[in-house]
Amino acid sequence: MVKGNWALFEEDFWSINTILQTLIHTSSSKSVMLIDKTGQLISSIGEPPGFDVTSFASLAAADFAANQQLAEMVGETDFATLVHQGTNESLYLSLIANRVILVVLFDKKTSLGLVRLKARRAGEELLSVLNKLFDKLQYKDEELSAASLGAEFAAE
């Protein structure tokens, strides 16, 4: 299930940003973003891009959605990574936990192979952080639901 609203705890925010910062340094990338599948920007690290990040996040999510349809048409369940290579600028996108998209913007000063390797490692670390976050959010939602239910019964 894709949720459009994110509750990010401070410790998780810093864990995510530390992973993204490490990815930028180890891959010599320009910028890294974490976007949810609805197109909401979760975090952005690195050089500020010369474009509207909100629009970019929406387009990246739509790109992944379109490619998922293409994957199904050719008999795949999904394409977990996408690459867009340009003459000067390139994008590497990777789906993590089937809920968020890691986007790495890099130029010709670094190689796709290096970006792919470092992004894969960062993805594994992000998966661990995100799974813990999802567990917290589910637990939090259950607490809120139980509290609300109890309050409704107490009011009668």
PLM region descriptions:
Residues M1-S29, T38-E156:
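Acidic, low-complexity cytosolic segments
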